[in-house]
UniProtKB/Swiss-Prot annotation:
GO terms for cellular component: extracellular region. Keywords: Antibiotic, Antimicrobial, Cell wall, Fungicide, Plant defense, Secreted. This is Defensin D5. It is found in: Secreted, Cell wall. The lineage of its organism: Eukaryota, Viridiplantae, Streptophyta, Embryophyta, Tracheophyta. It comes from the Eukaryota. GO terms for biological process: defense response to bacterium; defense response to fungus; killing of cells of another organism. The keyword Cell membrane does not apply. The keyword Lyase does not apply.
Amino acid sequence: MFFSSKKCKTVXKTFRGPCVRNAN
C-alpha cells in the first residue's frame, strides 16, 4: 500500500485499515 511500515502501525491502529494486519 502507499502507507509506510511505520505509518502502517499508527494508521492501522487508528483507522484499522489494511495495515492493521502489520500492526497486529
